[in-house]
Amino acid sequence: MNHFELTYKPFGERSILVEWPSKIDESILSDVLRFKEILQKEHIKEKVHIKSAYNSLLIIYNHTIENIYDKISVLKRLYLEESRVNKRVLRRWMVPVCYDDIFGIDLDELTKEFQLSKSEIIELHSKSNYTVFFIGFLPGFLYLGGLDERLHFPRKETPRLKVAKGAVAIGGKQTGVYPNESPGGWNIIGNSPINFFDVSKEVPCFAQSGDRISFYQVSKKEYDNIKALVEAGVYQIESEVIDG
């Protein structure tokens, strides 16, 4: 098991921020999620809210922390213990994407920047297996690591006021899908017809941190057919269990 050099710092009167090395890395993400599970089990009788990101955990207690150093000492001990954590059940989700011009509104610009054809960009984007590193800034927005280096491109200096629901986009070293219509500054290359956040479901977002996402290309006709199934409430996204 990898142990990293962590930093622990107070974050307001009721929270502690735990930080790993500042980089996007699957081994760090795995360690973050492992420690999160340990803390959730340790505090099962205490109402503690734990938020995870790429390389950090924010631990929010239900009371003011009286002695921050005692709390941090406990956290350090728990982290270093070889705790028995059940293997997490992770899944790979197969997500359909239509890259037609009607959806991929930034593809023309990216072909010039990358010196690649549209078909080459689509192939590079759809052949990678992505890891869900973080879910935010909108509910159901999956920040995905694993984008081919040839497709890395900065976000727009001036964000669009309106990005369509399902827009598949590139921002820096990552790719992601806008779960709902919203402002956004990522570069849009396609659209997925499925729901990434559905409040009518017991679990609104089908994916969790650590899961994998594989995109596959569909035609506009296939896109419309899938969208009709989604709207009818009968579409089932394909997935498979992978090692956690």
Where are these regions (language model features)?
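Glycine-rich active-site loops that engage anionic ligands at enzyme catalytic sites
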Residues: 1-244
